């Protein structure tokens, strides 16, 4: 800007109003103004009044002296040229040609003229140009007054225009006069500010307030430590404010000295302190605009109160005296913007430049703009500049230059003396970036050569001592901040460290919980929570739901508008901000009062051992933790909640590890080699990298062709020099140079730009639906060559758009517009750099086309491979393992965002940008590469390509297995599958081997190296053969009818045949008990038992008992044998030793199946014992405290049985009584008498027994005897032999008693109690009389439930337990287990309460079963999917219930209250049926015979939202799931068919795989037509129509000769297995088929079995053999008694043959009977009468009296007797 006046080197003449000016100067020079509204200094109005102020008041204003005044004078039409012009420059236009609004300008100028009383005719306002307006004057005095007035009003803040005097008549004395006037004006203004300025007043009030607070603390005695610390903090704040005021006054005095020093005027100013440095270097002519800007900037600094302002002179002193200084100041102290201005103001840089480096380009540009704005008018134009990129042709010319540390490094390489730079400021040194550390090391060497160079290292949290010691123990200056005190609260989490649920670490949930707790309990104030990633931030925002608060995300991928939301106010709602470490130092959020520190941060770390850069979550450093805590004390005292312990904090690193130890050193080594540093290991780093990192970096540079080794010294190649000039990461530079060689320069530059910004281009934020939409939008850009090609296509399309459309296009396609612009800036910088440094022309055209596959794709892939040759990974061949990194052998997966996944394929070889370590490790920025290209690399890759390819896992498919076999092959929860995988890996010594089962495709995929494939295949085939054998042998154990007693059992198996019919009540099923801690392999265990017993297993049931349940934990399961002989043999063997564990087999409690299946009833447990050591006759009674005297009185004279006992007090114990003379009495016998005499139940009595134990029978013998006795006493209800189980424990040497555990069926509790009561006091065989059995009158049982069930039924369970407590006879106790579950222990003195209480508990804890006709196996299988699990969780949350899914049996139960169960059942049925229906309306876009790019083609053809299909199929609702490659159709089946047709047409088009083959129609072997509603048989996998199979079953039921039922396929004939019958037939039909099969079995048994002779009786009995006697069969169904030999009524004592004859001729039996007997017939009724003794008078049953001698008949007995006496001489009695 031009000066307002010429240099003040002219004198004043005697004729130029000396007296007036002298008087004006002397009287008004140092007087301050009394009020802002008073007229300007030395100014009087000159218009419309006497002009006494002017020398000749007779002349009017603007009067020229060459003309005489005349009252009639009228000015000519053409105005005369003015002598003086005062121009007004607008501040916005002072340094530019900015166009201003003319009307606004004119209004402002006219208002200002009116204020200064300037005539309207003097005003001129141009429409264009940088001059806002001007005033014309003829008289000097008017012009001078106008200038002074305008500056006065500007100083008062009434306008912003800059006055500038343009004199047409130059008189030196006039200029001096004006200078004096303005100097007086400015001096008065400065004095006014120092005395009464508004800023000064506020600061003084603040000092007074702080002083009062300090005094109030000082008046108190005995201050606590916290209060004392608070006092110290306030004193520090007060001192800071005082220093600010002193600094302001010092600056004002510095300006005053400059103002008065021009002409040597004396002024009463305090002398400068000794050694003080002038804060302003003001020389030469007065620049009033600059002086005013300096004053205003000082006022702003005073009001802003930046802490560094108080340290200005202290900083300047140090910089003037010392060459190096470390400046430590907290974020927000102002060091980044103010220090450069301090140095520029003070002139420390002289005529050279001050350079301030920043780690990031955006920071350098932002700070330069800010400093330029703050210092506007304080310096000349272009004093402050920013150099974001290096150019070898540009020189540093500005006074203050902001640039990146990378840019300064490039300058250093060009000019190793940094000529033209006098001061270097390294900002943000606490970040310890690679460039910063390298720059510090190079500057250290330079400082010894350039003594005039100054270095200032600025940091917020850096280790000042380390930096000071590194720089020759230089000085450290600490700038204390203005933070408020922050209370630290350590609140470590109870969850296991690093535990992960659903991909989210546990600490994220802890942060959300803490935020909820703070919101509920703490006062108002914003909550700021620190997490590590965008995913965690979004997860936390979704989980934090509170009406009175708003959760806001803050991370680097948000747009500016979204980030700005955290700075806005939300009335009535508390802000809860979940942020990444972007909120640590980069941003200052107002109002934050509470901080939640998770203690975790995500860092990129280079691992020299593997040569990989890994982004992983780790602990923060102490300095970062303090930074986070400091966020809570910006505006008021705050609190920081650290979710870790104080010990954890103490164990953290003090500072963040320097980047030089965390990143690849390629760029640094290139620059050092370019600088001639040959021995890098001995280079003087601040923190030297580990030697391995240096070696790996050198190896990488050699691989890239940038470095070669000659004579043991590494030298740069020609390509290496080019990479140095580019200043990029070597891999990016290699990428660009490689593309230029293939004439694809544009593509190479863009690739380098997008690769550097790859993680932020696609914008996947928001809720779940938003993210899914973003995924769909991304598909249209996905390229089958990988992520870099995808990013390249995105940039190409974006760059082709007009600029005004780009932002909207990014928004529509979920792209980050800011990242795209950043890529564009990078592209432009690279183009300029390449043209300037490499003299290459950057092409403006594209060669590569993303829509066409050409040679350019191959070239690009080759260039990318050459640039990332060390980052190669090979697909292992096994999806679960993913890719194997070539250098390290790690198995990692592609990141879910990888473009390759959109094509459903995994290329064999890929290159990747970096490894991302979150919960798992992922490859990111992945590009496919060709196998042949690996051999073309020069130099060759640092791994053996051929060897890696040989180790690749091959795949072998095992087909022909049914879904049932595959499920059983996997086992419950895949345990059997995992076991066989473990065995295969152990056998082959290869942990990569895998086995994958696809039930939908009915195949097993084996993954193994070629050499091991046969071993793995053999293992799998053996297991499959086992499962197939068991499936073919599988039987249903069915009772022929329901009832007790001797109920026949049939084994109903494959072919619908009866495999065995058991009518002799021999058991077939055994319970298997496993005693061992290791998890057992079920298949191995069953195979072991079959071999040991030499029998076939036909049914297996695995118990689902909780391992923590002490009653059930040893039970493995239940197995059924095909023959009772095998079952008996299994139970006869005492123990099986299996892999170091013990197996025991017992006859099973519960057998049967179908409608006659007997339910298993929970067991009740009782304990018994008998002594092993004989009694000594003495015992001890322990009394409750304080009751011994009373008890002694009660038992003073005691007789027990026939024994008189002696009572005495124990002298060695205060609460014991000794009792002797007991003989062989037991503890129970004595205690019963004692309790009766004392009427107490709290006594404790024990007998002193002899030292040695007597010989007892073995535990096995005791078990058998006890079982025999108890079972004999329980036989009233014909119980099964297995209703009682007895276990006698092996005693230890020091045990006084033998102990046994008895378990019995809870239904028989009454019989069991009676049996145990009778057993009490008995003596077992082989025991002595005193070894009496004692049954503990305490029965126990327990039941366990999971924590989830407990939380659901907690209230009902408590109510139930409370009711149990009120009942007599039993107790219940609830206790948690160590694994988080809950156990209910039931204790009672009788068995019935135990059984009843357990039954009610089981009903509550096991829930209500859900039976719905629509819940088929296929429908219920949805619940095992991820969507099904989420569905159950949602219903559980909404209905407050818990849903139990039995995955093995596919049954569903619901726990909760009756009302809630009903609601949950209704919702579950509705939701699951809807989901099943939707699954029927899914179209899959991925499969073995589907073109891999089908999903992209669908998106390309119909749009990401499938709008093209919706327009053609009206009313259909479609949604594309990109993760699963599925189109979900919501609409009718007809709509689905239409959509499917459109997709199929697209799929048939030409693709990389060619046309899709036509589907082969399958013919049903029964109806010989195309299969309709097909079903594959489990045994042979042949496909039939389901209806045909059902018809086959129906025909077999009608024709008994059709058994067994076989597969109808030609050359098959395999029996249809039980699994098929269960799947195809209802229970009713299955029972009907069983009945038909039973009839067929009996009919075809060759007479071995027969049905009961009673019509329609279902019972069957075994026919006695020819040599067997006819044993009776008592039918349990109809109670008939039948001879098993002749099948007639049971006929004891008569042979079957004779009984048959008697049946045929009843008289024959009478005659046979009468032989040899005194027998005659009644003459009347012909009845046979046998006479054995007595007289000859006989009476027949017909009532007639008969004479036995002559058979005469009489009606009465007297005539008969008379006849005997008369005719036969007597009645026939022998006298």
Curated annotation (Swiss-Prot):
One of its GO terms (cellular component) is chloroplast. InterPro entries: DEAD-box_helicase_OB_fold, DEAD/DEAH_box_helicase_dom, DEAH_win-hel_dom, DNA/RNA_helicase_DEAH_CS, Helicase-assoc_dom, Helicase_ATP-bd, Helicase_C-like, IBR_dom. Residues 316-480 form the Helicase ATP-binding domain. Its main location: plastid. Residues 1-33 form a transit peptide. Zn(2+) 1 binds at residues 1564, 1567, 1585, 1588. Residues 1560-1767 are annotated as: TRIAD supradomain. Residues 1-77 are annotated as: Disordered. Zn(2+) 4 binds at residues 1683, 1686, 1691, 1696. Zn(2+) 2 binds at residues 1580, 1582, 1607, 1612. CDD domains: BRcat_RBR, DEXHc_RHA-like, Rcat_RBR_DEAH12-like, SF2_C_RHA. It is found in: Plastid, Chloroplast. This is ATP-dependent RNA helicase DEAH12, chloroplastic. It comes from Arabidopsis thaliana.
């Amino acid at each position: 800007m031009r000066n307002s006046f010429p240099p003040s080197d002219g004198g004043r003449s005697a004729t130029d109003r000396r007296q007036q000016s002298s008087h004006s100067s002397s009287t008004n020079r140092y007087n301050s103004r009394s009020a802002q509204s008073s007229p300007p200094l030395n100014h009087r109005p000159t218009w419309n009044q006497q002009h006494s102020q002017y020398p000749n008041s007779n002349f009017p204003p603007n009067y020229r002296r060459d003309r005489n005044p005349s009252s009639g004078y009228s000015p000519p039409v053409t105005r005369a040229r003015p002598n003086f012009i005062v121009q007004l420059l607008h501040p916005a236009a002072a340094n530019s040609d900015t166009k201003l609004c003319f009307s606004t300008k004119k209004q402002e100028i006219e208002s200002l003229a009116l204020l200064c009383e300037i005539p309207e005719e003097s005003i001129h306002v141009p429409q264009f140009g940088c001059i806002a307006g001007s005033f014309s004057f003829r008289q000097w005095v008017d012009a001078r007054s106008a200038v002074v007035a305008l500056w006065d009003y500007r100083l008062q803040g009434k306008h912003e225009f800059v006055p500038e005097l343009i004199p047409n008549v130059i008189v030196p004395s006039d200029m001096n006069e004006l200078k004096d006037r303005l100097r007086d004006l400015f001096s008065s203004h400065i004095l006014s500010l120092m005395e009464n300025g508004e800023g000064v007043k506020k600061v003084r009030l603040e000092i007074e307030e702080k002083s009062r607070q300090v005094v109030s603390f000082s008046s108190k005695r005995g201050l606590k430590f916290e209060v004392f610390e608070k006092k110290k903090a306030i004193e520090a704040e007060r001192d800071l404010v005082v220093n600010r005021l002193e600094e302001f006054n010092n600056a004002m005095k510095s300006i005053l000295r400059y103002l008065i020093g021009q002409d040597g005027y004396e002024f009463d100013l305090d002398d400068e302190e000794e050694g003080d440095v002038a804060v302003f270097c003001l020389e030469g002519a007065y620049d009033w605009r600059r002086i005013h800007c300096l004053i205003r900037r000082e006022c702003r600094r005073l009001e802003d109160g930046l802490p560094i302002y108080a340290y200005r002179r202290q900083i300047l002193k140090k910089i003037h005296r010392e060459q190096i200084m470390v400046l430590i100041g907290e974020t927000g102290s102002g060091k980044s913007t103010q220090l450069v201005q301090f140095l520029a103001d003070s002139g420390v840089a002289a005529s050279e430049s001050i350079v301030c480096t920043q780690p990031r380009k955006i920071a350098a540009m932002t700070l330069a703009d800010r400093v330029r704005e703050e210092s506007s008018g304080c310096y000349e134009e272009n004093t402050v500049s920013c150099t974001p990129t290096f150019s070898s042709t540009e020189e540093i010319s500005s006074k203050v230059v902001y640039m990146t540390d990378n840019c300064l490094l490039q300058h250093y390489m060009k000019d190793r003396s940094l000529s033209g730079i006098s001061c270097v400021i390294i900002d943000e040194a606490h970040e310890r970036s690679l460039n910063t550390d390298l720059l510090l090391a190079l500057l250290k060497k330079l400082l010894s050569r350039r003594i005039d160079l100054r270095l200032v290292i600025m940091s917020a949290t850096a280790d000042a001592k380390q930096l000071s010691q590194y720089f020759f123990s230089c000085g450290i200056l600490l700038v204390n901040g203005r933070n408020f005190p922050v209370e630290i609260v350590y609140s470590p989490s109870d969850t296991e460290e690093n535990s992960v649920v659903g991909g989210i670490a546990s600490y994220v949930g802890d942060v959300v919980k803490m935020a909820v707790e703070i919101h509920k309990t703490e006062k108002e104030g914003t909550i700021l929570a620190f997490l590590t990633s965008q995913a965690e931030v979004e997860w936390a925002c979704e989980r934090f739901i509170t009406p009175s608060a708003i959760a806001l995300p803050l991370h680097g991928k948000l747009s500016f508008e979204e980030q700005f939301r955290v700075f806005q106010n939300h009335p009535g709602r508390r802000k809860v901000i979940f942020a990444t470490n972007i909120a640590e130092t980069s941003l200052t959020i107002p109002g934050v009062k509470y901080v939640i520190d998770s203690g975790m941060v995500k860092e990129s770390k280079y691992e020299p051992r593997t040569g990989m850069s890994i982004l992983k979550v780790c602990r923060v450093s102490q300095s970062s933790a303090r930074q986070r805590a400091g966020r809570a004390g910006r505006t008021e005292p705050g609190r920081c909640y650290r979710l870790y312990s104080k010990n954890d904090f103490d164990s953290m690193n003090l500072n963040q590890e320097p980047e030089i130890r965390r990143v690849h050193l390629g760029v640094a080594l290139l620059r050092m080699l370019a600088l001639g540093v040959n021995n890098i290991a001995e280079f003087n780093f601040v923190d030297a990298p580990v030697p391995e990192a240096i070696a790996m970096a050198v190896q990488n540079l050699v691989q890239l062709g940038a470095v070669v080794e000659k004579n043991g010294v590494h030298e740069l190649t020609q390509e290496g020099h080019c990479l140095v000039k580019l200043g990029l990461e070597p891999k990016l530079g290699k990428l660009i140079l490689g593309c230029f060689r293939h004439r694809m320069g544009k593509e190479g530059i863009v690739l380098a730009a997008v690769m550097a910004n790859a993680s932020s281009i696609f914008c996947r934020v928001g809720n779940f639906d938003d993210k899914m939409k973003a995924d769909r939008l991304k598909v249209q850009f996905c390229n089958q060559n990988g992520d870099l090609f995808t990013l390249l296509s995105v940039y190409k399309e974006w760059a082709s758009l007009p600029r005004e459309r780009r932002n909207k296009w990014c928004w529509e396609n979920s792209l980050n517009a800011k990242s795209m612009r950043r890529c564009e800036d990078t592209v432009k910088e690279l183009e300029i750099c390449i043209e300037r440094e490499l003299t290459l022309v950057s092409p403006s055209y594209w060669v590569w086309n993303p829509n066409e596959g050409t040679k350019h794709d191959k070239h690009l892939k080759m260039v990318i491979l050459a640039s990332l040759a060390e980052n190669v990974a090979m697909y292992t061949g096994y999806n679960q393992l993913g890719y194997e990194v070539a250098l390290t052998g790690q198995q990692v997966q592609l990141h879910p965002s990888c473009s390759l996944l959109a094509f459903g394929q995994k290329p064999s070889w890929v290159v990747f940008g970096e490894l991302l370590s979150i919960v798992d490790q992922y490859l990111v920025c992945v590009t496919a590469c060709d196998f042949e290209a690996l051999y073309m690399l020069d130099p060759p890759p640092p791994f053996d390509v051929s060897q890696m390819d040989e180790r690749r896992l091959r795949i072998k498919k095992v087909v022909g297995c049914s879904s049932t076999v595959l499920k059983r092959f996997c086992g419950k929860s895949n345990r059997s599958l995992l076991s066989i995988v473990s065995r295969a890996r152990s056998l082959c010594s290869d942990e990569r081997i895998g086995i994958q089962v696809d039930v939908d495709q009915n195949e097993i995929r084996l993954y193994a190296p070629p050499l091991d494939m046969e071993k793995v295949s053999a293992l799998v085939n053996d297991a499959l053969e086992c499962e197939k054998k068991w499936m073919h042998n599988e039987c249903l154990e069915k009772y022929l009818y329901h009832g007790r007693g001797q109920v026949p059992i049939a084994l109903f198996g494959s072919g619908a045949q009866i495999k065995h019919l058991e009518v002799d009540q021999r058991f077939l099923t055994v319970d298997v008990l496993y005693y061992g801690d290791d998890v057992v392999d079920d298949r191995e265990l069953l195979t072991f038992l079959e071999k040991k017993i030499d029998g076939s297993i036909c049914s297996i049931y695995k118990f689902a008992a909780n391992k923590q349940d002490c009653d059930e934990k040893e039970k493995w399961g239940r197995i059924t044998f095909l023959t009772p002989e095998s079952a008996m043999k299994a139970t006869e063997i005492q123990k099986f030793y299996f892999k170091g564990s013990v197996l025991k087999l017992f006859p099973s409690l519960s057998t049967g199946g179908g409608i006659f299946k007997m339910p298993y009833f929970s067991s009740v447990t009782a304990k018994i014992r008998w002594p092993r050591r004989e009694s000594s006759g003495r015992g001890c009674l322990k009394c409750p405290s304080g009751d011994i005297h009373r008890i002694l009185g009660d038992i003073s004279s005691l007789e027990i049985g026939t024994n008189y006992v002696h009572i005495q007090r124990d002298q060695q114990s205060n609460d014991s009584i000794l009792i002797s003379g007991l003989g062989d009495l037991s503890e129970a016998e004595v205690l019963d008498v004692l309790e009766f005499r004392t009427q107490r139940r709290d006594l404790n009595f024990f007998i002193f027994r002899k030292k040695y134990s007597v010989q007892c029978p073995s535990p096995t013998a005791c078990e058998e005897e006890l079982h025999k006795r108890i079972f004999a006493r329980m036989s009233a209800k014909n119980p099964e032999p297995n209703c009682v189980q007895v276990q006698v424990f092996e005693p230890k040497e020091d045990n006084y008693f033998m102990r046994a555990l008895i378990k019995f069926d809870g239904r028989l509790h009454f019989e069991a109690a009676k049996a145990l009561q009778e057993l009490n006091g008995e003596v077992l065989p082989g025991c002595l009389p005193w070894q009496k059995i004692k049954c503990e009158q305490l029965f126990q049982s327990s039941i366990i439930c999971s924590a989830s069930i407990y939380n659901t039924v907690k209230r009902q369970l408590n109510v139930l337990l409370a009711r149990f407590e009120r009942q007599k006879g039993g107790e219940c106790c609830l206790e948690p287990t160590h694994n988080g579950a809950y156990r209910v222990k039931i204790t009672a003195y009788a068995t019935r309460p135990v059984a009843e209480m357990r039954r009610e508990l089981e009903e509550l804890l096991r829930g209500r079963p859900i039976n719905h006709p629509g819940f088929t196996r296929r429908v219920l299988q949805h619940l095992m999917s991820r969507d099904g699990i989420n569905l159950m969780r949602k219903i559980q949350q909404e209905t407050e219930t818990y849903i139990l899914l039995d995955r093995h049996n596919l049954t569903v139960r619901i726990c909760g209250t009756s009302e809630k169960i009903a609601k949950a059942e209704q919702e579950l049925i509705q939701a699951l049926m809807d989901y099943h229906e939707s699954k029927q309306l899914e179209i899959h876009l991925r499969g073995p015979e589907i073109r891999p790019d089908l999903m992209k083609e669908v998106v390309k053809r119909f749009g990401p939202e499938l709008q093209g299909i919706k327009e053609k199929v009206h009313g259909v609702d479609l949604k594309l799931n990109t993760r699963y490659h599925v189109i979900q159709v919501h609409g009718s089946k007809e709509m689905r068919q239409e959509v499917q047709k459109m997709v199929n047409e697209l799929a048939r088009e030409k693709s990389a795989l060619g046309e899709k083959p036509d589907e082969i129609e399958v013919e049903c072997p029964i109806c010989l037509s195309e299969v309709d509603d097909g079903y594959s048989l489990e045994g042979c996998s042949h496909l039939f129509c389901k209806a045909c199979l059902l018809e086959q079953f129906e025909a077999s039921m009608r024709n008994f000769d059709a058994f067994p039922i076989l597969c109808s396929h030609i050359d098959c004939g395999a029996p249809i297995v039980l699994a098929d019958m269960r799947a195809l037939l209802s229970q009713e039909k299955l029972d009907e088929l069983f009945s038909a099969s039973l009839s067929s079995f009996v009919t075809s048994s060759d007479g071995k079995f027969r049905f009961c002779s009673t019509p329609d009786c279902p019972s069957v009995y075994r026919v006695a053999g020819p040599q067997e006697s006819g044993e009776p069969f008592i039918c349990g169904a109809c109670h008939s008694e039948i001879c098993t030999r002749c099948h007639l009524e049971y006929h004891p004592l008569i042979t079957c043959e004779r009984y048959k004859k008697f049946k045929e001729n009843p008289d024959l039996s009478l005659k046979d009977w009468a032989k040899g007997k005194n027998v005659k017939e009644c003459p009347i009724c012909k009845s046979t009468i046998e006479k054995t003794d007595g007289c000859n008078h006989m009476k027949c049953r017909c009532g007639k009296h008969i004479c036995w001698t002559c058979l005469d008949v009489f009606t009465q007995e007297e005539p008969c007797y008379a006849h005997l006496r008369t005719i036969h001489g007597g009645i026939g009695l022998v006298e």
